[in-house]
Structures are given as C-alpha cells and as structure tokens.
Amino acid sequence: MPTIQQLVRAQRKRIVKKTKSPALCACPQRRGVCTRVYTTTPKKPNSALRKVARVRLSSGFEVTAYIPGIGHNLQEHSVVLIRGGRVKDLPGVRYHIVRGTLDTAGVKERKQSRSKYGVKRVTKK
C-alpha cells in the first residue's frame, strides 16, 4: 500500500487491457479480400485438414481466418467478412470468416445452427 506522498509523486498506473483481435480495430466485423485459400494441420493430438484463408483487411492488416462449416466456395480475390474468434488447435488463427455474407456462400443442406452458417430457413410444402 503506497503512502499519500508516494501517490502525489507518481500516480497509480492503469492496467491496459490488450485486445485479442487487434486487426478489427474495435469493430465487430471487417471486410477483406482473400489473398490465399489453403488447408493446414492442427496441433497435437488432433488430426485434420482445416480450411483457412489469408485475408487482407480494409483496416490494412493481413490475417489468417478460419472457414467454418463443410465445404466452401472461396478462392483468391473473394471478398469476405471477418469476425473475431480464435481456433484453439490452429496457432495464429484468431479470426473467423462469416458464412452467407458478401462472396461467401452458406453451408449447403444445413438444418441446425443455421444462423452461424448463413443458411435461410427451409419452408415445408
């Protein structure tokens, strides 16, 4: 506990909160252009080919973003929307691509959790 004289001499330092998604620049989402679409392997003990894209954002950053869902239509020069959210078993992947917006199509034949994958409700006839 500092004395009053110590507080007069030097004010208390504020704790600076570091953001987990700096490329978004305090925005909920950002638009970007895919520069490379590829697959990568996760950390141990998992094994898969995870679909990711290197995206140049409108904020000037170039980030790696995960493509969620089964199948996608992304290729180089596709315009995508990026949101925050890391992928635990892919080091360096701190962003997700939003499905069903801009050039990204929604997941085909998705019945549950549709809003997360950009799928409209199917109407029964």
Swiss-Prot record:
Read off the SUPFAM superfamilies from this record.
Nucleic acid-binding proteins
Molecular function (Gene Ontology), one example: rRNA binding
Source organism superkingdom: Eukaryota
Determine if Ribosomal protein is one of this entry's keywords: yes
Q: What's a single GO BP term from this record?
A: translation
Matches recorded under Pfam families:
Ribosom_S12_S23
Query: Could you tell me where this protein is found in the cell?
Result: Plastid, Chloroplast
Keyword set, alphabetical order: Chloroplast, Plastid, Ribonucleoprotein, Ribosomal protein, RNA-binding, rRNA-binding
Classification via InterPro entries: NA-bd_OB-fold (IPR012340), Ribosomal_uS12 (IPR006032), Ribosomal_uS12_bac (IPR005679)
Gene3D superfamilies membership:
Nucleic acid-binding proteins (2.40.50.140)
Record-level GO cellular component terms: chloroplast; small ribosomal subunit
Which regions span the lipid bilayer?
none
> For this UniProt entry, what is the primary localization, expressed as one broad class?
plastid
Its subunit composition reads:
Part of the 30S ribosomal subunit.
What the protein does?
With S4 and S5 plays an important role in translational accuracy. Located at the interface of the 30S and 50S subunits.
State the family named in the UniProt similarity comment for this chain. Belongs to the universal ribosomal protein uS12 family.
Q: Which NCBIfam families match?
A: rpsL_bact
Q: Which PANTHER family has this protein been placed in?
A: 30S RIBOSOMAL PROTEIN S12 FAMILY MEMBER (PTHR11652)
Its protein name is: Small ribosomal subunit protein uS12c
Which source organism does the UniProt entry give? Nephroselmis olivacea
**Which lineage?**
Eukaryota, Viridiplantae, Chlorophyta, Nephroselmidophyceae, Nephroselmidales
